[in-house]
Amino acid sequence: MQMADIARIAGVSKSTVSRALADSPLVNDKTKSLIRDIAQQHGYRINIAARNFRLKESLTVALLIPEADGVDWTISDAFFLEMTAAIAEALDQRGHALLLTRTSPQSGEWIEEFVRRRQADGIILIGQGSQHEVIQNIAKTFRGISVWGEAIAGAPYPTVGTDNFLGGQRATEHLLKRGCKRIAFVGYEPAPEIQARFQGYLSAIHAADIQHDETIVFSAVVGSSSANLVLERIIDQREMIDGFFVATDQQAVALMTALQKIGVDIPSQCAIVGYDDLPIARWYHPALTTIHQSRTLGAQILVDNLLAAIEGRDTASVKLDPELVVRESA
């Protein structure tokens, strides 16, 4: 239901509908009552964000981190902090404010409930977590959403993110070029972005005519209760592995620390490639070879997409090119 539809049903102009819903004295009470009744019957809601945008008022944008089943992601995670800083800068450059929170969705209306309670004009989500279907259902009626994550076929919301498949492929190909034959994968596979990186890893393995071994695929997330158990499994199988593609830099650094504690030399005994290119990748010893994600460019596109959606313009998903950054670990 659009404002033009209400105008057609009421037999008035679109501008009259706009004035009536804004309680303008230029519209008589009888017409206001008619228009409000029609709007209520059809579930029409005034898009406050769009109105503010047209009036050039500052918008409040909420940055949410959807939870993933069984995973304790927090806003203190290094990647989220980096993305938050980039998004805050992009919003500030455009004169808008950032509201930061973590959410634990309980129903299919969690985004709308958040907007209603917190008075945010739009939502930026960092990753889909395990909430893709929830986000998809809400995006069918609520336009003010912009998502950093993996593009999913048929999804009604635009995403911005690195080409995760290509990034996983490039990381694995680099390990293969170094002569690695038994390359393990470490990452939380159910997350859409990580699953795409895993598929890129598999593609490179198969292209090299190497048989995929499921016993050296380790599903883990830094901060989860099972992370230490996964590290123990990796250490137990370390001698049969000569390379690791790790789906995040935080996981890669945790793995390198564990391996160095038991005397493994990196990269001569075991090469490691991460993903994200966080500052710690440069500072750690040995410095981490990784896949760079352009968080600054990504944040700018996320904000531009959100403002376009609020204004009612069409937006499209964007995939950024992943860059292999070669350092000391591989």
Which positions does each model-derived feature cover?
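N-terminal helix-turn-helix DNA-binding module of bacterial transcription factors
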Residues: M1-L59
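Periplasmic-binding protein-like
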Residues: D121-I126, A184-G187, V217, R238-T248, ...
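Short acidic/polar active-site loop segments enriched in Thr and Asp
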Residues: S13, L59, D121, C180-R182, ...
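Short acidic capping loops at alpha-helix termini that bridge into adjacent secondary structure
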Residues: R182, H212-I216, D265-A271
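Flexible loop/turn connectors
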Residues: N228-A330
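Alpha-helical recognition/docking segments in bacterial nutrient-uptake
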Residues: T60-L64, A68-E173, I234-M240
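Hinge/beta->alpha junction and helix N-cap segments in small-molecule ligand-binding domains
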Residues: D69-E82, L100-G108, V160-R170, V186-V230, ...
